[in-house]
Amino acid sequence: MNIGLRASVRRKRFDEHIKTNIGFTAALRIGSGAKAADGNGEYFMVYVFLAEGFEEIEALTPVDLLRRAGAEVRTVGVGSKNITGAHGITVACDMSEDEASASIKEAPEALEMTVLPGGMPGTLNLGKSETVSHFLDAAAKRGAYIGAICAAPSVLGAKGLLRGRRAVCYPGFEEKLTGAKIENAGVVRDGNIICARAAGSAVEFALCLVSALKGERAAEEVRHAIIAQ
């Protein structure tokens, strides 16, 4: 069974258990296959937040490549579970904000990564979300990974998460990355925070997320599978 099929099977099991009343924590441990590095059998989750007007490539490329690498990924709709992107593509998200919040309330150790795509007005809507803010606070507190691309690093900047960090964003948003050390690059990783410039950097951004979660070998396997340069 290939890695993509295994991940698909795990997601199906996860969702089936969520629909029962056995509790999120139990479902998370039964339905997911991504084990913690400490080998204690704990399971982790990646949350990708989508708000009205999000940039589709920047959101779905990370979802696709992370799942190819075997990561457990859930899309979270801000304001609704059906979210329409900047170019008219509507996505039926896996979770509502309330469901996502409940999931980390019951299993805070499951928060492995939070990802914010850019796009307009998607980025502005992400910045207004209390749920997104809560997830970023929780991720920063526990040292979980945070990924943001295009205009979305401005959401991190507004929360002071980029002070003293190397970062990059869509041209023109630099002043919103308060305290950051702006670099001229497509993708920049500084510790647990990964930023990318724009839609054209979506594949490299996603591969960097894979590398952070699963290691460079996994990222290279995905790169080879999609024939990325």
Which residues fall in each region the model found?
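N-terminal polybasic/positive-inside topogenic patches
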Residues: 3-18, 23, 28-39
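Accessible peptide chain termini
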Residues: 1-3, 23, 45, 74
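Extended, subdomain-level signal for the structured scaffold at the beginning of enzyme domains
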Residues: 30, 34, 39-142, 155-158, ...
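Short, hydrophobic beta-strand segments that form beta-sheet elements in well-ordered domains
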Residues: 75-77, 146-150, 165-170
